[in-house]
Regions:
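Acidic/histidine-rich catalytic cores of soluble enzymes
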Residues: 2, 7, 13, 30, ...
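Short coil/turn segments at secondary-structure junctions
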Residues: 45, 80, 84, 116-121, ...
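The substrate-binding groove and active-site-proximal loops of carbohydrate-active enzymes
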Residues: 9, 46-52, 78-87, 233-236
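Flexible, active-site-proximal loop/turn residues at the rims of small-molecule/cofactor binding pockets
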Residues: 36, 81, 114, 190, ...
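Active-site acidic/histidine proton-transfer and metal-coordination neighborhood
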Residues: 16-17, 21-23, 58-74, 81-176, ...
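Residues that line or immediately flank small-molecule/substrate-binding pockets and catalytic motifs
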Residues: 34, 79, 112, 204, ...
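A short, Lys/Arg-enriched amphipathic alpha-helix followed by its capping loop at the start of a domain
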Residues: 3, 21-27
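Glycine-rich, proline-tolerant flexible connector loops at the mouths of alpha/beta enzymes
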Residues: 31-60, 113-118
């Protein structure tokens, strides 16, 4: 286990580049967001993107990593299988997993977002998500890259959704990107958050660590989703 940080979070913190932020923070690993066009942020120049679909872009990223003693802990994907372009998203995700394999990156964070899931219900969202993520796994079965669904949003923080997807897909390569703050953000009482974490611990492939400092009298209450997050969020 080792500590890394999101590329976007480093820049949000005011650092002039990802590499500069990593050095100041004493961290040598970064989680990198891959955009829909297969570009990623340069680690040394935030105004520059590297195209991972081209040999030149891939080489440029590898050079930055080697020259600065940095490794990529995971790729991050912002997929949404509720959109009309799910087929194109699967292709993008497959390409990303294959690049991850080529670079020796062991994990890819995938999103639990399914826009409009309310109109098809949780069961419909489970079927839709499972169908698409199965395609990604099957198309990359010659790799050992692990996919971690982040417990994110109004759907992904429902344990019944996550459990049903894992059972429907039944792949050892599919698990959880455990966000330690999101189950709490969703409104689960603190003791329930710990129960959920224990339940899914064997499925964890990757983690996002953050905290919310609700006052003691609110910690065991079932709260509305996202209740006063801006007030109580507590950066670690």
């Amino acid at each position: 286990m080792f500590v890394s940080i999101r590329d976007d979070v480093v820049l949000h913190g005011g650092f002039s580049s990802v590499v500069k932020g990593l050095r100041d923070l004493g961290i040598d690993a970064v989680e990198v967001r891959v955009r829909r066009d297969l570009t990623v942020l340069s680690l040394v120049n935030p105004s520059q993107l590297h195209d991972l679909s081209s040999p030149e872009g891939l080489k440029a990223l590898e050079t930055e990593l080697a020259q600065n003693g940095v490794r990529i802990s995971a790729f991050l994907l912002g997929n949404d299988f509720g959109r009309d372009d799910a087929e194109e998203q699967v292709e993008w995700m497959v390409k990303t997993v294959k690049v991850a394999h080529q670079l020796g990156i062991n994990a890819v964070r995938v999103d639990a977002i399914v826009s409009g899931w309310e109109s098809i219900g949780v069961d419909g969202a489970i079927r839709l998500f499972a169908e698409n993520i199965k395609q990604v796994l099957e198309a990359t079965d010659d790799t050992d890259v692990q996919l971690g669904i982040e417990n994110h949003g109004t759907l992904g923080n429902r344990p019944e959704f996550l459990q049903a997807v894992f059972e429907a897909v039944s792949s050892p390569r599919l698990g959880l990107t455990l966000d330690t703050g999101n189950f709490y953000w969703f409104g689960h009482p603190l003791s329930r958050v710990y129960e959920i974490m224990r339940q899914f611990a064997p499925k964890v492939k990757h983690t996002h660590v953050k905290n919310i400092a609700y006052p003691p009298e609110m910690r065991e209450q079932q709260r509305p989703i996202g209740y006063e997050y801006g007030r109580y969020v507590c950066p670690i």
